[in-house]
Every structure is written in structure tokens, then in C-alpha cells.
Amino acid sequence: MKRLPDSELEIMMIIWDLDKPVTRFEIEAQMDQGRRLSPTTVLSFLSRLQEKGFLAVQKSGKNNVYIALIDRESYMQAESRSILKRIYRNSARNFIAALYDGDSLSD
């Protein structure tokens, strides 16, 4: 599974949060106020996500509706495994040691 750049991941997080097929307009409405993107930029990200196999697109009247093909949990698992492999050389022990900085752990 391809790793997503932050901008595309932001779009996918919105789609996963809405948990239904969505239009570009619904995605734009959910974006952070300080992070407004132009409609063409959002469409560009959606097109890339479709090319990468993360989204399917269907026509609904005049609008395109975007459907997640990869669920959040699958992506997060793949991303976690990738981080563990790339940074911690597949060692959960090294990963846990990096999280623990000498202070007591809390819940």
C-alpha cells in the first residue's frame, strides 16, 4: 500500500470520518477553516487518490461521489508497520524504548 502525503491523508481522514460516499463539496465543508484549498486542488488530490486505488468515483446527477476503497484501519496498520520497519528495523522493543523517555508511563 502506498504511503500518502499529508495533504492526501487529510482528504482520506475526512472521507473516513464521514463514513459514507461523499462529494467534493462535503469534503471542502469539513476542511479546517485555516486550511481552505481551492476546488481544483481538492479535485487534484481526489484524482491522485483514485489513481492510487484509495478511492472509487461514481456519478450522481451532476456530481462525482467518492467512495473509500481502503478503510482507515487497514491504512493505519500498513503505516504503523512501515514506520516500525523503516525507523525501528522491525523491532517493537526499539519502538517502545523510543516512546519511553525515562518518565513513568501513564494510561
Task: Locate each region found by the language model.
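Short, cationic-aromatic polyanion-contact patches
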Residues: 3-7, 60-79
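Pre-recognition alpha-helix immediately N-terminal to the DNA-recognition helix
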Residues: 9-14, 26
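Short helix-to-turn junction characteristic of helix-turn-helix DNA-binding domains
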Residues: 15-19
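Short acidic, hydrophobic short linear motifs in intrinsically disordered regions
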Residues: 21-31
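Short, hydrophobic-biased segments on the C-terminal half of alpha helices
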Residues: 43-47
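Glycine-centered, phosphate/nucleic-acid-interacting loop/turn motifs that mediate DNA/RNA or nucleotide
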Residues: 53
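Short beta-strand "wing" residues that participate in macromolecule-binding interfaces
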Residues: 57
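Amphipathic alpha-helical dimerization/coiled-coil segments
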Residues: 78-107
